[in-house]
Amino acid sequence: MKVWYGAPEAAREHYEAQVVDAEIAGGARAFAVEIGFHAEHPKESENAAALARLCEREARWRPELGEDAVAGAFLGRGSWRRVSETWPDPDLDDPDLAFDIGVRLVEYIRVLEPLR
């Protein structure tokens, strides 16, 4: 699931909840769900700038997103950047899983979007 804000060129910066392979998600045996913000511009410098803007304001978002939020290189693609967290091997039989993912994604949007 992806959520975009702003002009079409801003689509390279978005919020996303996605399944990622265990090989790139630390602590997972089968897979993980990644939730958060992504900067996926073709130029690494643009991604670094997007992340730098958020890192400059980390004192404002860290208390709300917590220590699980990682600001750094994108999982599986070093030129992209992220502020996101992973949930290793979530229980797919949990009837609240989709709701919990959606709520957490909205928390990232609510906290980070005003700072971008």
Set out the residue ranges of the language-model regions.
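Ampiphathic alpha-helical segments that act as solvent-exposed interaction surfaces
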Residues: 52-65, 88-116
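Short, intrinsically disordered low-complexity segments
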Residues: 71-97
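Polyanion-binding interface signature
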Residues: 1-80
